[in-house]
Structure formats: C-alpha cells, structure tokens
A protein has these predicted regions:
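Extended hydrophobic secondary-structure segments that form protein cores and membrane-embedded regions
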Residues: 22, 105-110
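Catalytic active-site module of serine/aspartate enzymes centered on a nucleophile-bearing elbow/loop
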Residues: 109-110, 117-144
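The feature captures the conserved acid-bearing segment of alpha/beta-hydrolase catalytic domains
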Residues: 1-100, 113-114
C-alpha cells in the first residue's frame, strides 16, 4: 500500500517542495485511470495526494466527476491538446498550485494507454524545464 509513502510525506510536509507530473491513459488496463467506480484507493489519486502532502498543499478529498469528467476535481490552466495519433486521441491536462507556483501537473491521454506516448514527453518537459534547485538552500526555484 501507500501508507509508508504517505507517512514519509507527512514527516517532510512543509520542509521540501517537489515538482511532479503525472501521465495516465484513459484506456490503460494496467494502471487504471480514474473513473466514478474506481477512484477510491486508486494508484494515481494516492500518488497525487502524497505529492500534495509533501509539498504542504491542500490535499484532494472525494472526487466529483460532475466537476471534472476526467480528473474528478478542479485543476487550473486546464487545456486539451489534439494529437496526430488517431481519431479521438487527445491529451488533457491541468495543474495544482502552491501560491503562484504550479507544483503538480496532471495529464490524461484519452483513448490510449500511458506508456510510450511521445506527445506526452513534450508536455512533461514543458512543465519541468521551469524548475531548478538552489544549490545552497536546496529550495525549489520556479522561473517562467
């Protein structure tokens, strides 16, 4: 289970910030994407909550797919990206902020599994390229 990881995140809450980008495929049969019938104890949601905790952010509670049909809760900077991978295969993403810093980006690939999806690599890089760490203080830095 994720209890040991959550315990570690609770211990470090507020002492460290870590950027995180998660990519899920809505048709992945190995790591199931979020759905109204499976979100409780879902691996994606558990991981997002761990990163929210360690970053000292508000932790997502129960999901409501009426609020957001893909993720079940409100994300900022919500976007959809068309791909050339086939009919209906699009990417959606949004972000969670701590103050004015987007620390967590969540990406869903519609009608696709999550692995080896080259367009997702660009979305991931476009997120992480803004981060660096101050070598003295170890503080996470974010630049536009």
């Amino acid at each position: 289970g994720t209890e040991p990881l959550m315990d570690e995140a609770i211990q470090k809450r507020g002492y460290v910030e870590v950027g995180y980008c998660s990519v899920m495929g809505t048709h992945d049969e190995v790591v199931r994407s979020l759905r109204p019938d499976n979100w409780q104890d879902n691996a994606y949601l558990n991981t997002w909550r761990i990163y929210q905790t360690i970053n000292g952010m508000e932790v997502t509670g129960d999901l409501d797919f009426g609020v957001d049909a893909t993720f079940g809760f409100t994300l900022q900077d919500r976007q959809q990206i068309l791909t050339n991978k086939g009919e209906g295969i699009t990417m959606e993403y949004g972000q969670l902020y701590k103050g004015d810093k987007p620390l967590i980006r969540l990406v869903a690939i519609n009608k696709y599994a999550h692995w080896n999806f080259k367009p997702a690599a660009r979305v991931i890089w476009d997120f992480f390229r803004h981060f660096s760490r101050d070598m003295k203080t170890k503080k996470l830095m974010y630049t536009e």
